[in-house]
């Protein structure tokens, strides 16, 4: 990747932790997902990252909910890359593979390691929530094999430098092929602190991964793997600025952060994607079209 490449802007459309009491823009029903996807795509998003919910807002891992949401999104926009979450606590791998097999998204997230996962409140001097996010290698490999069988591109979500280091052994095993699509997730307590220097360190490690055969025919062909940043909470905007100047892609949406840089709560995912697009253009880059995004990700 380079500064000459267009920017893949992903919209994290819903998440499963926040709710409408915190932000009215969070979609619950398939129709609301479709409307939010349309707003995001109109502002420059080329990929939509989905956590499924039931119409009452409850997180769901059921085929019918993923299917209904995906159908609503595809009915609302001409074209967009659909990306499913597979990150859960307490949901068996087989259950996650079921909805991947039934719905066949182009991309699916794959968390690259286990960690403490928490949110800390300085005012309370305590954790708002804390959990162990378990992603052992045996589960990573099982999900990778399923994605390979189904023709789904894995999005490797790395919460620390050590997670990046877990990629090369999987390539050596033959279950992971170049070009890689890697996102640096920053801002979760228990993961790497959300600073531009730490992002640069993660990117250096990504770029050290062998790229033989990576992306020979796509946009940016021959320049290696695709990477981006996922900034959690209000550090998101600083990290987006850093990623754009380092040549990476970006993600925004109500899953990650509810607020614009001035502290105003977003009225929709479209507000957040519009801000991300303006920042992209302000550094002399441009949003990727959906076709260009597929090329950069190696799924064209």
Indicate where each model-derived feature is located.
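Active-site beta->alpha loop and helix N-cap motifs at the rims of alpha/beta catalytic domains
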Residues: 60-134
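N-terminal small/glycine-rich loop or linker at the start of catalytic domains
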Residues: 1-25, 114-127
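Alpha-helix-loop-beta-strand connector modules within alpha/beta enzyme cores
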Residues: 59-84, 143, 202-210, 222, ...
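Catalytic alpha/beta core domains of metabolic enzymes, predominantly
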Residues: 107-254
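Glycine-rich, proline-tolerant flexible connector loops at the mouths of alpha/beta enzymes
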Residues: 21, 47-66, 185-186, 190, ...
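Conserved, mostly hydrophobic/aromatic
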Residues: 33, 40, 51, 108, ...
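C-terminal helical cap(s) of enzyme catalytic domains, especially alpha/beta-barrels
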Residues: 120-122, 261-281
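Active-site mouth loops of central-metabolism enzymes
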Residues: 15-32, 86-93, 129-134, 191, ...
């Amino acid at each position: 990747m380079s500064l000459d490449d267009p920017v893949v802007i992903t919209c994290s459309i819903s998440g499963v932790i926040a709710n409408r009491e915190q932000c009215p823009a969070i979609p619950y029903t398939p129709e609301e997902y479709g409307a939010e996807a349309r707003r995001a795509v109109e502002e420059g998003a080329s990929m939509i990252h989905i956590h499924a919910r039931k119409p009452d807002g409850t997180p769901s891992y059921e085929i019918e909910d993923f299917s209904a949401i995906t159908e609503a999104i595809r009915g609302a926009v001409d074209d967009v890359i659909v990306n499913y979450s597979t990150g859960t606590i307490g949901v068996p791998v087989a259950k996650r593979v079921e909805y991947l097999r039934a719905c066949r998204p182009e991309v699916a997230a794959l968390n690259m390691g286990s960690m403490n996962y928490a949110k800390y409140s300085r005012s309370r001097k305590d954790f708002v929530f804390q959990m162990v996010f378990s992603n052992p290698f045996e589960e990573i490999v099982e999900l990778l094999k399923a994605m390979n069988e189904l023709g789904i591109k894995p999005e490797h979500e790395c919460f620390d430098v050590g997670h990046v280091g877990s990629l090369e052994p999987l390539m050596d095993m033959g279950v992971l092929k170049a070009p890689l699509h890697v996102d640096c997730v920053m801002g979760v307590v228990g993961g790497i602190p959300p600073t531009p220097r730490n992002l640069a360190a993660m990117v250096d490690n990504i770029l050290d991964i062998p790229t033989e055969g990576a992306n020979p025919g796509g946009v940016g062909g021959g320049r290696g793997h695709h990477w981006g940043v996922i900034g959690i909470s209000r550090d998101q905007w600083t990290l987006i600025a850093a990623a754009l100047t380092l040549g990476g892609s970006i993600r925004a949406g109500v899953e990650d952060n509810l607020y614009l840089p001035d502290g105003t709560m977003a009225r929709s995912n479209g507000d957040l994607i519009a801000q991300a697009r303006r920042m992209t253009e302000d550094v002399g880059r441009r949003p990727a079209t959906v076709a260009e995004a597929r090329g950069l990700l190696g799924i064209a």
